[in-house]
Amino acid sequence: MARIAGVDLPRDKRVEIALTYIYGIGKPTSQKILAQSGVNPDTRVRNLTEEEINKLRDIIEKNYKVEGDLRREVALNIKRLIEIGCYRGLRHRRGLPVRGQRTKTNARTRKGPRKTVGVRRKK
């Protein structure tokens, strides 16, 4: 099994798709990586030679920020926004949508499940 950037790539998938299992690499990036390395995108991971795997690993390590490093950078960026107290930081802190979406209705993914507010009547 090919292991790149700490991720085991699925053996039965095409290399182009298998590379997208690495956090920070999508389809366009995987196509660029394969073009640089000269590996055929239609090749299955199980059919890759050790040399091809090493070539892919080198290109990814040198040119791309992936997995833990990328996750850490994103987390630090969000933390910085929160610390400086900008609008986006406040939205992150409150768990609301950051990019201008409406919140009167919808936004359930970001807000979480509804908290129903009950009304008490006098007896």
Curated annotation (Swiss-Prot):
Protein family (similarity comment): Belongs to the universal ribosomal protein uS13 family.
GO biological process, one term: translation
Record key words, sorted: Ribonucleoprotein, Ribosomal protein, RNA-binding, rRNA-binding, tRNA-binding
Domain of life, per lineage: Bacteria
Upper taxonomic lineage: Bacteria, Bacillati, Bacillota, Clostridia, Eubacteriales
Pfam families, sorted: Ribosomal_S13
Stretches for region Disordered: 97-123
Record-linked InterPro entries: Rbsml_uS13_C (IPR027437), Ribosomal_uS13 (IPR001892), Ribosomal_uS13-like_H2TH (IPR010979), Ribosomal_uS13_bac-type (IPR019980), Ribosomal_uS13_CS (IPR018269)
GO CC annotation, single: small ribosomal subunit
Protein name: Small ribosomal subunit protein uS13
Subunit structure: Part of the 30S ribosomal subunit. Forms a loose heterodimer with protein S19. Forms two bridges to the 50S subunit in the 70S ribosome.
Keyword rRNA-binding: yes
Protein purpose: Located at the top of the head of the 30S subunit, it contacts several helices of the 16S rRNA. In the 70S ribosome it contacts the 23S rRNA (bridge B1a) and protein L5 of the 50S subunit (bridge B1b), connecting the 2 subunits; these bridges are implicated in subunit movement. Contacts the tRNAs in the A and P-sites.
Span of the signal peptide: none
Entry's Gene Ontology molecular function annotations: rRNA binding; structural constituent of ribosome; tRNA binding
Coiled coil regions, renumbered to chain: none
Naturally occurring in which organism (per UniProt): Pelotomaculum thermopropionicum (strain DSM 13744 / JCM 10971 / SI)
NCBIfam families: uS13_bact
